[in-house]
């Protein structure tokens, strides 16, 4: 399944100066002004944060927001990469509601950010009266180290490992659980787990798959 993201407002082009403190990025606009944008990505953004990279920003609609821009896209090679990790949930929700993902079709209700497990929230919970609930965890994928191959994670993710354990617990309780990786770039046709970056996560995923 592939999706085209439509932003509510035209994006603004700039050039990356630096990304720092995980959630901040200084970007030079075409006017020459240097602004600080919100970086909605807690990962390492390996290969996507080099100074001088072309960046695309969305303007904040809330005039009271401290940071007036959000960093949405960065150019990597000949293509653009979506680095906003808050977008995949909306993309997948729209795809499910539109019947585009056969494996997740046929449920009566879709809810987002539902509490479950040990102080966690599931990205999407699908429910119907006549079938077990389905817990869907979504991960944003941006890493490409090998031509055509997207990988996850791009840094050690203890939180991701915790989520896998909680999904396994849901399966043990009789529910269905799905781990969905959304690749936010167009230059990859394959996907793999970056076991060398986080072997603990890779092992946890194997255990979760074995658990159902």
What are these regions (language model features)?
Residues 21-27:
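Short aromatic-glycine-enriched beta-strand elements
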Residues 197-212:
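N-terminal intrinsically disordered, cationic/polar leader segments
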Residues 76-86, 97, 102-142, 162:
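Active-site metal-binding core of divalent-cation-utilizing nuclease and nuclease-like domains
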Residues 35-45:
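Short alpha-helix capping/helix-loop boundary micro-motifs
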Residues 62-79:
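OB-fold/S1-family single-stranded nucleic acid-binding modules
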Residues 14-16:
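Conserved hydrophobic positions within beta-strands
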Residues 145-158, 165-197:
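Nucleic-acid nuclease catalytic cores
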Residues 43-56:
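Short nucleic-acid-contacting surface segments enriched for D/E, G, S/T with interspersed K/R
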């Amino acid at each position: 399944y592939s999706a085209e993201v439509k932003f509510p407002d035209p994006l603004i082009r700039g050039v990356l100066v630096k990304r720092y403190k995980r959630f901040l990025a200084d970007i030079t606009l075409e006017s020459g002004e240097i602004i600080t944008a919100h970086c909605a990505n807690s990962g390492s953004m390996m290969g996507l944060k080099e100074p001088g990279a072309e960046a695309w920003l969305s303007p904040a609609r809330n005039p009271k927001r401290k940071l007036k821009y959000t960093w949405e896209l960065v150019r990597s090679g000949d293509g653009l990469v979506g680095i906003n990790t808050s977008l995949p949930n909306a993309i997948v929700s729209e795809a499910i509601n539109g019947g585009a993902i056969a494996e997740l079709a046929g449920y009566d209700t879709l809810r987002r950010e539902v509490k479950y497990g040990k102080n966690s929230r599931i990205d999407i919970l699908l429910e119907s009266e006549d079938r077990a609930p389905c817990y869907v965890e979504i991960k944003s994928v941006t890493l490409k180290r090998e031509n055509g191959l997207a990988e996850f994670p791009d840094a050690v993710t203890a939180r991701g490992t915790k989520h896998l354990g909680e999904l396994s617990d849901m399966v043990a309780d009789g529910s269905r659980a799905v781990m969905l990786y959304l690749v936010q770039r167009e230059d990859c046709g394959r996907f793999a787990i970056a076991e060398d970056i986080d072997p603990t996560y890779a092992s946890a995923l194997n255990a979760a798959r074995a658990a159902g």
